[in-house]
Amino acid sequence: MKMIIQIFFIISLISTISFASVQDFCVADPKGPQSPSGYSCKNPDQVTENDFAFTGLGTAGNTSNIIKAAVTPAFAPAYAGINGLGVSLARLDLAGGGVIPLHTHPGASEVLVVIQGTICAGFISSANKVYLKTLNRGDSMVFPQGLLHFQLNSGKGPALAFVAFGSSSPGLQILPFALFANDLPSELVEATTFLSDAEVKKLKGVLGGTN
């Protein structure tokens, strides 16, 4: 319980500009138009307490996949009540050897809190300096907006962490999938990554890319 309180305290700190300063809330209406500031607002007369609650973070994600990890997001519009409030969160489950590969959130900074296990986490600055830290239960680390970062289970058992973001829709781009899980011609991938034809085709084969 103390750990959960810490997580939500962090969430309350990472948002400095809130839609709620204009009106009480703007529950996401997924059927309406979306703008850079978020989803359009649901009719207040149709808003219920269920819009402000999310129950999906208590269940472990399925880590039976190539990265041996799972992310359970609580973003808008799935978590409708956080729309426009400048916060969101997610659950990270990592089996032994599991990894959240190098990725970036273009729309928000991220704070991670380790609940179980040991996680090696780090990010790379725009000057290509690496900031790397081994985190244990109760430890936290912040990842600045837009910078490449990762989380790796470096312990002997499963690892669990919760992350909070300074946006209700932080966005996500995972570098290996962006490079090799698409239909960009292999010769262009080779030219822009300095990898060989065999290496590119191997990675595309593993991650589902074509061409």
UniProtKB/Swiss-Prot annotation:
GO terms for cellular component: apoplast; extracellular matrix; nucleus; plastid; secretory vesicle. Expressed in leaves and flowers. Induction: Expressed with a circadian rhythm, with peak expression at the beginning of the night. Residues 1-20 form the signal peptide. Pfam families: Cupin_1. Glycans are attached at N62. Belongs to the germin family. This is Germin-like protein subfamily 3 member 3. It comes from Arabidopsis thaliana (Mouse-ear cress).
